[in-house]
Amino acid sequence: MAAPFSGSGTKQDPWLLKTPSGTSDISMYKDPSANPPALVCFTSGTELRYHLRAIEDLHQMLKAHGDWMELGNADEQKPAKDGTVEAWGRSPDNPVGGWYGLKKGLRGRFGNYVPPVLEALGLVELEHNPRNNRVRAI
């Protein structure tokens, strides 16, 4: 079941979401005028930025994967578990050739903050357990 959310994804009306575990609030919006275009995330007073194309790219990757995939959340300074959304979000083999995160030192946690946006857009099914959540394309 999709987590409740509100907002339209603009700076004036951001998506108000929760992390997959439901333990943290996140506010996200699209900033297409940024260079490069960004998906902006605010959580616990911290701003993170990801390539805006992450929404479409992640959805396409999950569709091609065809099954559930672990999120595998990890900070930038920690290695990501192979075969997870987090590992894909920093892989040299993804469409951007590396990190989707744009702010050095805050490029991790892709698997924690980007999938809830895809869920809000109706693109994925996302688990909401205390730990070890997974995602799959719809």
Per-region residue spans from a language model:
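C-terminal engagement modules used by replication, chromatin/transcription, nuclear envelope/ESCRT
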Residues: 134-138
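Generic alpha-helical scaffold signal
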Residues: 49-52, 108, 112
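Short, hydrophobic-biased segments on the C-terminal half of alpha helices
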Residues: 59, 112-116
